[in-house]
Curated annotation (Swiss-Prot):
Record-linked CDD domains: HisA
Active site, renumbered: 10 (proton acceptor), 129 (proton donor)
SUPFAM superfamilies (UniProt xref): Ribulose-phoshate binding barrel
Organism this protein belongs to: Mycobacterium ulcerans (strain Agy99)
Domain of life: Bacteria
Lineage, broadest ranks: Bacteria, Bacillati, Actinomycetota, Actinomycetes, Mycobacteriales
Name of protein: Phosphoribosyl isomerase A
Length: 244
């Protein structure tokens, strides 16, 4: 299977934006979220990674808009951002998205997270936002503002609960165009049977080709954001590169 590419649409107040290292206030705006998503669909995307940054940072939500975007797309959507209780999860699933990503909730409310994994199976993935500090792999929560514990311990727990998929971000790379952390991706994929989706740092077609070499180890897809918006390459070029 070729590497699956998921163009990212990060939403703040209804607009598509990109952040640098996930920091609020570092946004660059790229127009309406719906237009951005439809554009990626037109360019051949099979998946869209749709993120409610307002909900992730706990400052409101774009729930109605996200439901509208999912409804107008013909491709699969992975929905993320601020999904941390029954209400927000139900609303996310009600949009008709293919799956949701739990982030902070997996760290702050492990019992709830385990229950959602058991109830919803393949429809729930867990986002692991990793910061490597002094050689230690720490998880970050609440829009990367809080410490969420040791990556390997949390991964072992989630695996034992049957988590179906992980979205792995190196926080120091995201939105920086600094290249993906291949060592981290291979490390996570090597410790779990569940597929892994790479996120953060992709800056070139060579970066995507490098991630694509990990498909045999369990890396199934890559989320691409800033590089596409900054015009480093087009989505059709990227799709060709990972299928070579």
């Amino acid at each position: 299977m070729p590497l699956i590419l998921l163009p990212a649409v990060d939403v703040v107040e209804g607009r598509a934006v990109r952040l640098v290292q996930g920091k609020a206030g570092s946004e660059t705006e790229y127009g309406s979220a719906l237009d951005a998503a439809l554009g990626w669909q037109r360019d051949g995307a099979e998946w869209i990674h749709l993120v409610d940054l307002d909900a992730a940072f706990g400052r409101g939500s774009n729930r109605e808009l996200l439901a509208e975007v999912v409804g107008k797309l013909d491709v699969a959507v992975e929905l993320s951002g601020g999904i941390r209780d029954d209400d927000s999860l139900a609303a996310a699933l009600a949009t008709g998205c293919a799956r949701v990503n739990l982030g902070t909730a997996a760290l702050e409310n492990p019992q709830w997270c385990a229950r959602m994994i058991a109830e919803h199976g393949e429809k729930v993935a867990v986002g692991l936002d990793v910061q490597i500090v002094g050689g230690k792999h720490r998880l970050r929560g609440r829009g990367w503002e809080t410490d969420g514990g040791d990556l390997w311990e949390v991964l072992q727990r989630l695996d034992s609960e049957g988590c179906s998929r992980y979205v792995v971000t190196d926080v120091t790379k995201d939105g920086t165009l600094a290249g993906p952390n291949l060592e981290l991706l291979a490390g996570v994929a090597g410790r779990t049977e569940a597929p892994v989706i790479a996120s953060g740092g992709v800056s070139s077609l060579d970066d995507l080709r490098a991630i694509a070499t990990l498909t045999g180890q369990g890396v199934e897809g890559a989320i691409v954001g800033k590089a596409l918006y900054a015009g480093r390459f087009t989505l059709p070029q990227a799709l060709t590169a990972v299928r070579e």
